[in-house]
Amino acid sequence: MSTNRRIGATDSKSRAHLLDVAERMLLEEGYAAVTSRKLGARAEVSPQLVHYYFRTMDELFVEVFRRRAEESLQRVAEALAEDGSLVSVWELTSNPLGARFNLEFAALANHRKAISAEIAAYGERFRQLQHAAIAARFDELGISAEELPPT
């Protein structure tokens, strides 16, 4: 028997605040510290409000990851459009805070399939961006991809 439970608006300021606080907690204390009760207390809302916006903690974690992943992909696309330099892309994606974020989500993905699937989808999109940039650079230089060994 399914219920028609209400879910909060995805563009709500309260929802965005919960995502911000959850991300801070994740980076400061690790993913295990992010529970609906602790998140509610830190965000100064009830745990029920957390579940009003996110049916499950998996849904919350996916949204935290997705938000940063989308920002990352956007920054990478902009860097490639500006100068086409892969160095600028790699500099963008190799900051310590980003590394900590990715490590927490990698650890979380060991226990939650939804997170694992989201990371895989992001990885594929990021790979496609890099592939397109490398292929374009090869074309500019008149290099055939077949001329270079993969290693």
Describe the function of each predicted region.
Residues 1-13, 24, 143-144:
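N-terminal intrinsically disordered/low-complexity leader segments
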Residues 14-17, 21-59, 63:
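Helix-turn-helix
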Residues 22, 89, 102-106:
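Generic hydrophobic alpha-helical segments
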Residues 52, 91-94, 107, 111:
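Amphipathic alpha-helical interaction elements
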Residues 57, 64-68, 126:
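The DNA-recognition helices of helix-turn-helix-type DNA-binding domains
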Residues 63, 70-100, 150-151:
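Hydrophobic alpha-helical connector segments
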Residues 73-74, 94-103, 113-142:
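Amphipathic alpha-helical packing segments from all-alpha helical-bundle domains
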Residues 142-151:
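Short, intrinsically disordered, charge-balanced linker/junction segments flanking boundaries
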